[in-house]
Amino acid sequence: MYNMVSLFIVAVLLLTYANVEGSDVTGGFPVNSNNCIYPCYSTQDEIQCEEFCEKLNGRLGYCRRDACYCEHLPESVKQITNSKTFDCSNGPWDLSTV
């Protein structure tokens, strides 16, 4: 019984540490000049999102809430950090509109 309790406590501590470590990752949804997000639904979109984020000097890109999300984007990149504020969706993935 003591071993089970000890294991549970260690697991909770590890999960808490992992959650705290992940909470300071900055990122956002890149937008074009019209504040439109880039849609992201499928595996192909996710690959495109990852490449797009790298071009924007972010480290990781993936689909989140049906939009392209980039982690570690520079502050100079226009982005939305609150996913509740999507106004429109951009069709083509075009860096010239960022």
Swiss-Prot record:
Keyword Signal among UniProt keywords: yes
SUPFAM superfamilies xref list: Scorpion toxin-like
Tissue expression notes: Expressed by the venom gland.
An annotated Gene Ontology molecular function: sodium channel inhibitor activity
Disulfide bridge partners, by residue number: 36-88, 40-63, 49-68, 53-70
Subcellular location: Secreted
Family designation: Belongs to the long (4 C-C) scorpion toxin superfamily. Sodium channel inhibitor family.
Note on domains (UniProt): Has the structural arrangement of an alpha-helix connected to antiparallel beta-sheets by disulfide bonds (CS-alpha/beta).
Protein name, entry field: Probable sodium channel toxin Ts27
